[in-house]
Amino acid sequence: MARLILLRHGQSAWNLENRFTGWTDVDLSPAGEAEALAAARLIRDEGLDFSVCHTSMLTRAIRTLHLVQQELDRLWTPVRKHWRLNERHYGALQGLDKRETAARHGEDQVFVWRRSYDVPPPVIAPDDPKHPVHDPRYADVPPDVLPCGESLEATVARVLPYWYDAIAPDLMAGRDVLVAAHGNSLRALVMHLDGLDREDVSRLDIPTGLPRLYELDAALRPVSYRYLGDPAEAEERARAVAAQGRLEKN
């Protein structure tokens, strides 16, 4: 039976500041570093291991993975980095404070941008310096496939080819796999694994720094899945993700 661990990166500096991050390359906060180390201990306490790792091209996911590997004395484990595991691209929203954006555009509009399945955020132009076409880490990616703002639907379409081309073959070969990625790229994988529809995945929240363990049959269908650690903590962290972008009530 193959095992797959999905891990959202620890809290980032912009998670802490409640900003839309997307493809902006920010680092972990001190709390995020602690979450990554705690995730490693949860994996160790369950007696789990992994023989190959996958992550995105963004620092917060890469550093989360490295902290887990270091804590578990697994820095030698092969790692594959790929842009298809990057966070959803939030277009012109990247860098904006979520609550300030809600105050300006309304909570309902921000909810649609964040949680709807097929509505993209306002996009950025290809000549914008923040467009990924200008980032050297994507120099080998065809410019016409680099996003300028994505819906969750577009994120799913971007992520799933990597599942079929890289992650699934590792699992089919009998390797236990750790994927350290982002809230929306992981939502795409969970949607596929759990057979969620667009309404279900729109309500799905992935907490930072908590490993989600899947046990998969020979056809890579889930036999079981759960968050490691305290289920109440997983629910609390997921609620915190859902609350982002809401205005404070007086």
Curated annotation (Swiss-Prot):
Q: Which reaction does it catalyse?
A: (2R)-2-phosphoglycerate = (2R)-3-phosphoglycerate
Q: Does the keyword Isomerase apply?
A: yes
Query: Biological process GO annotation list?
Result: gluconeogenesis; glycolytic process
Residue stretches in coiled coil: none
A GO MF term: phosphoglycerate mutase activity
Could you say which residues bind substrate here? 8-15, 21-22, 60, 87-90, 98, 114-115, 183-184
Keywords for this protein: Gluconeogenesis, Glycolysis, Isomerase
Q: Name one Pfam family in it.
A: His_Phos_1
- Catalytic site: H9 (tele-phosphohistidine intermediate), E87 (proton donor/acceptor)
Pathway named in the protein's UniProt entry: Carbohydrate degradation; glycolysis; pyruvate from D-glyceraldehyde 3-phosphate: step 3/5
Task: Tell me which CDD domains the record gives.
Answer: HP_PGM_like (cd07067)
Q: What is its EC number?
A: 5.4.2.11
Q: Which domain of life is it from?
A: Bacteria
Q: Where is this site: Transition state stabilizer?
A: H182
Return the broad EC class.
Answer: isomerase
Function of the protein: Catalyzes the interconversion of 2-phosphoglycerate and 3-phosphoglycerate.
List the NCBIfam families: pgm_1, PRK14115.1
Protein family = Belongs to the phosphoglycerate mutase family. BPG-dependent PGAM subfamily.
Quaternary structure, from the entry: Homodimer.
Q: What is this protein called?
A: 2,3-bisphosphoglycerate-dependent phosphoglycerate mutase
Query: Source species, please?
Result: Nitratidesulfovibrio vulgaris (strain ATCC 29579 / DSM 644 / CCUG 34227 / NCIMB 8303 / VKM B-1760 / Hildenborough) (Desulfovibrio vulgaris)
Q: Top-down, what is the taxonomic lineage of the species of origin?
A: Bacteria, Pseudomonadati, Thermodesulfobacteriota, Desulfovibrionia, Desulfovibrionales
Gene name of this polypeptide: gpmA
